[in-house]
Amino acid sequence: MRLPLVDPSLDLLHNRRRLIDVRAPVEFAQGSLPGAVNLPLMDNEERHRVGIAYAEQGQDAAIALGKQLVDGGIKRARMTAWQQEIAAHPDALIYCFRGGLRSETAQQWLWEAGIERPRIRGGWKAMRKLICNHVDAASERPMLVISGLTGSAKTPLINNLEQGLDLEGCARHKGSAFGRHPLPAPCQIDFEHAMGMGLLNQQQPQGPTVVEDESRHIGAANVPLIFWRGMEKAPRVRVEMPLDWRLAQIRKDYIDDLWTLYQRQYGDWLGWALMRKQLSTALVRLRKRLGLARLQRLQRLQTLAFREHERGNRHAHEAWLGPLLTEYYDPLYRYQLEKHPQTFLHVGDWDSCLAFARDWSARHAA
């Protein structure tokens, strides 16, 4: 009996096919495919024991041990999980690390139960190679970088573009000391896969890309080197907005939106405690650059703002966010501009930069 195979393809991701990952949970946590659900053939301990048997006694002994470990009630439970997933997603595909014995075993068991589903040839490894190649290829196509002072709403601008790629969204981090997301950051592989999906979801997946001006490190994630080099040589647009506008935007980003996320994830009491801890810790991390006296002044203002926030006055945060912009972020940005002079295709307010980026994308369409 030759069990069906499908070739690895980005279309499987773009079309949001349900993928059943039969690797162990520890492998899944180290990097998964977008849209995949982890329904393992073996759990972490079983995989570990089979791996030892393979190393010490060879493949036949490892296979025999695997059959012994995953039998009876354990086998029935895992079969049930696969059957339920396929009932909910009849077009689901199966994969393991290389599309070999584990996914073939799952296929075989399902076939014996009257269910035929293909596995992906080459498995996770082949699909990851396609995603990474797609990300690298984007650096060879036209790319535009959106720059500007902190609070210029660059990320919302990116998300208003059909060819935009939100790197901060992929990293689940806003790229600054205050940018940590309440949910855990993705691992490096999942960050790269999120970039790949972002590119696939563009109106023209083979067209130009517009990104925000970022350092290569966004939180714990690193922008892939080839893509980063494409960003470095790409033309730039600079958003210029007045201080009061940027202050309102930064309050929305660092306070209003962050509170919504914490409240939704953890509830009022714990969410408030965790948000306060994040913001106060982030401020302390800037001690070296702010200096002790300035840090202590901002800490006092931040503490007062927290009290006012509890009374319903979120605008009070502008008392410490304002100096943070004018005394830290703005001078830092201007220093970087002086150190690395840049030529901008366009400099203007948010609306004009959005219009320019849309026009640029249309002119560079594939």
Per-segment meaning from a language model:
Residues 230-366:
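Conserved NTP phosphate-binding and transfer environment spanning the P-loop NTPase/kinase superfamily
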Residues 13-86:
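Positively charged, proline/Ser/Thr-rich regional signature most characteristic
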Residues 1-34, 132-139, 143-147:
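Flexible, polar/low-complexity N-terminal or interdomain linker segments that lie immediately upstream
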Residues 116-132, 139, 251:
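Long, charge-dense
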